[in-house]
Amino acid sequence: MTIRVSCAQIWPRLGDKEYNLQKMEQYIQQTMTEYPDTQLIVFPELATSGYEGTVEQFQALAETTEDGERIHRIGSLAAKYGIYIVYGFPERDMIHTDVLYNSAVLIDKDGKPMGTYRKVHPFASEKTWCRAGCEFPVFDTDLGRL
């Protein structure tokens, strides 16, 4: 079985949610125009927020997988093209809303989040704003286990 994967090399701007989201949307649309048989697009760590920031900046940028605007916007493109999308984002815990994670979400072909990986070994600067995850989740898809 052959799987067509596109890996996005983008440089997000710290704190500029709209710019970062537009860059991601443009990349998805361009990829699907040029390579319509793409099945999975993978974006980098913290693609929606930018990387080096303060606790306050990440608190303002964080979202949950249930109600995040970026989840919905990227999910709508996953559903439109029938593809899987992975991207990194600062995740807010749904129960303990002051707890943040450096996470990656897998969006399915219907545009819904399948699950989240929370970075297990954050670097020293990341530890100022995010908590370490403790699992290595695997997700069953029609492409195989991801």
Q: What residue spans do the PLM features occupy?
A:
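Short, basic and Ser/Thr-rich N-terminal targeting/leader segments
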Residues: 1, 79-86, 98-100, 132
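N-terminal active-site segment of His-dependent metallophosphoesterases
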Residues: 1-38
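Active-site-proximal beta-strand elements of phosphoester/diester hydrolases
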Residues: 2-16, 42, 103, 116-118, ...
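Catalytic metal-binding/acid-base residues of hydrolase active sites
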Residues: 11, 47, 90-91
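Active-site beta-strand/loop signature of hydrolases that rely on acidic residues for catalysis
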Residues: 20, 31-59, 78, 85-86
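Active-site catalytic loop in hydrolytic enzyme cores
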Residues: 66, 76, 93-146
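A short, hydrophobic beta-strand-centered structural micro-motif
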Residues: 67-92
